[in-house]
């Protein structure tokens, strides 16, 4: 976070080595996760962290389960407005811990481990949330606010999400113009051509929401919950304050 119009030093934000994230949105209309308000009053901004966690992450196990603690998010019921990554993460961590099978839910297990290795600093205790897996709506806002293209403008709109065959490179460059200021650009993981981010949100029993970025293609759409190994899936941790 770099408030104001300060001057860059060598193309970088002064003190950039201490940066921990980039604000995705501070629009009150998008700060809809009521559990964030209840747990800490963290309804000022959603922030994307500057590194990935995990690797080859499946969302959940096979046989597939329609998770009772999560809503099924479709385009018809407003997937783009689901800003509840924290609520969904907390619900899944609690549910899987109670069942003793969190290790079978690799994306959520990864964020749980990341919380342990990257805890909220003691000086910020109570002032920001723990890390969480972002929801479909929070990734929608990353694309709209940081990448310069709302998924609503994608030209391959389909029943399971949004896809565009050529916006990917332009959007990748735009967000990295900002992340390069703190020397933390997005990096390509899939055969040096793309990256696959897991969302917290479920679509139905066998499908979850994901971001697939294989330049020049970009998509925010549903994939099989067991797609992790095929796409070398990772989580991009978020927090709120």
Language-model features, listed with the residues they occupy:
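Short, compositionally biased
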Residues: 1-127, 224-241
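Short hydrophobic beta-strand that contains or immediately precedes a catalytic carboxylate
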Residues: 48, 133-134
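C-terminal, surface-exposed recognition/capping segments
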Residues: 136-241
